[in-house]
Curated annotation (Swiss-Prot):
SUPFAM superfamilies with a match to the protein in the record: S-adenosyl-L-methionine-dependent methyltransferases (SSF53335)
Required cofactor(s): Mg(2+)
Protein name: 1,3,7-trimethyluric acid N-methyltransferase CkTcS
Residues annotated as site: Involved in substrate discrimination: 154, 226, 270, 318, 333
Tissue-by-tissue expression: Expressed in leaves of cv. Kucha, but not in cv. Puer.
UniProt cofactor note: Binds 1 Mg(2+) ion per subunit.
Gene3D superfamilies named among the record's database cross-references: Methyltransferase, alpha-helical capping domain (1.10.1200.270), Vaccinia Virus protein VP39 (3.40.50.150)
Single GO biological process annotation from the record: alkaloid metabolic process
Pathway terms, separated by semicolons: Alkaloid biosynthesis
Binding-site list for S-adenosyl-L-homocysteine: 24, 67, 72, 104-105, 139-140
Organism listed in the record: Camellia sinensis var. assamica (Assam tea)
Length: 370
């Protein structure tokens, strides 16, 4: 099934479910590190809410968009609650309530997510801040909440996913324009780069438009997304995962295990923007001001092991956890073990040349009044 429509992507875009060896719960260490790097921005956002007297409303409504199933969303809840308690003590204010909405697409494993919730995360109802948690399935590219209902929005490593594979990647004759690749590469024609940027522009604008209606004036958004430092979208730093996956798929094509047409017609619905591209879209939309924006780099392999096979296998599991549902939809569930085994071998070979660092973008926005 080609990912050419929004409805189809919604059905297959989610992290690996459950708590098994290939699950996102067991393989979210990298996004956990990214989230921890961005926690100061979230803490500052909560401080800002109190400086704008939102605590006088006695309840703060927060949403974590694209929450997935791992421990990261629990860290977000704990951080917001801890900062609210800190400000309550400083301001000697009365007991506050925190309502947290955890959102993701319908395929997300909400059962595992809620099973992981504990009193450690949400506390009890007699504390300074009473915390209530609710699941909200649906696409954040459209409306999810009533108008002017959210004070704080958080999203980590979700906004770079697209609603569909970019439009216009086949010629008038029906030929694939990104043949042999699943993302932008050095060999991709300019039209592929333009199509990806255009799709991200359209989708991120929809995201901002929906939030502009849901977030209260002066409310805050803290967004963390995968991005790039270079102005070139085919820079290896931003596309090496998709390059290595495409090589693994191509090898299985050469072995007759995957139809070549399936590779040629598959384009991953994801885009890693530059800081300039993100800034331009926010300013064009005009609903939010940029309070803070920065890019930071992390080693793609956040591991201490010296054994390159151990490191390669762990990295492959991390990638499998967030790519398998959408990859298996195109190429078949029965081929996944072979594909990711091949991917592991390719990663280990690349470790000799050292994998590029991964760039993340932190974006803190405030809803414009009026």
């Amino acid at each position: 099934m080609e990912l050419a429509t929004r409805g189809k992507v919604k059905e297959v875009l989610f992290m690996n479910t459950g708590e098994g060896e290939s699950s996102y719960v067991q393989n979210s260490s990298f996004t956990e590190k990214v989230a921890s790097m961005a926690m100061p921005a979230l803490e500052n956002a909560v401080e800002t809410l109190f400086s704008k007297d939102f605590h006088l409303f006695q309840a703060i409504n927060a949403a974590d968009l694209g929450c997935a199933t791992g421990p990261n969303t629990f860290a977000v809840i704990s951080t917001i609650k801890r900062m609210m308690e800190k400000k309550c003590r400083e301001l000697n204010c009365q007991t506050l309530e925190l309502q947290v909405y955890m959102n993701d697409l319908f395929g997300n494993d909400f059962n595992t997510l809620f099973k992981g919730l504990s009193s450690k995360v949400i506390g009890n109802k007699c504390e300074e801040v009473s915390c209530y948690v609710m699941g909200v399935p649906g696409s954040f590219h459209g409306r999810l909440f009533p108008r002017n209902s959210l004070h704080l929005v958080h999203s980590s490593y979700s906004v770079h996913w697209l609603t569909q594979a970019p439009k216009g990647l086949t010629s008038r004759e029906g030929l694939a324009l990104n043949k042999g690749r699943i993302y932008i590469s050095k060999t991709s024609p300019p039209v592929v780069r333009e199509a990806y940027l255009s799709q991200f522009h359209e989708d991120f604008t929809m995201f901002l438009n929906a939030r502009s209606q849901e977030v209260v004036p002066n409310g805050c958004m803290v967004l963390i997304l995968r991005g790039r430092q270079s102005s070139d979208p085919s820079d290896m730093q931003s596309c090496f995962i998709w390059e290595l996956l495409a090589i693994a798929i191509a090898e299985l094509v050469s072995q007759g295990l995957i139809d070549e047409d399936k590779l040629d017609t598959f384009n991953i619905p994801c885009y890693f923007p530059s800081l300039e591209e993100v800034k331009d879209i926010v300013e064009r939309d005009g609903s939010f001001t940029i309070d803070h924006m920065e890019g930071f780099e992390l080693d793609s392999l956040q591991m201490q092991e010296n054994d390159k096979w151990v490191r390669g296998e762990k990295f492959a599991k991390i990638v499998r956890a967030f790519t398998e549902p959408i990859i298996s939809n195109q190429f078949g569930h029965e081929i996944m073990d072979k594909l990711y085994d091949k991917f592991t071998h390719i990663v280990v070979s690349d470790l000799e040349a050292k994998l590029p660092k991964t760039t993340s973008i932190i974006l803190v926005l405030s809803k414009i009044v009026g």
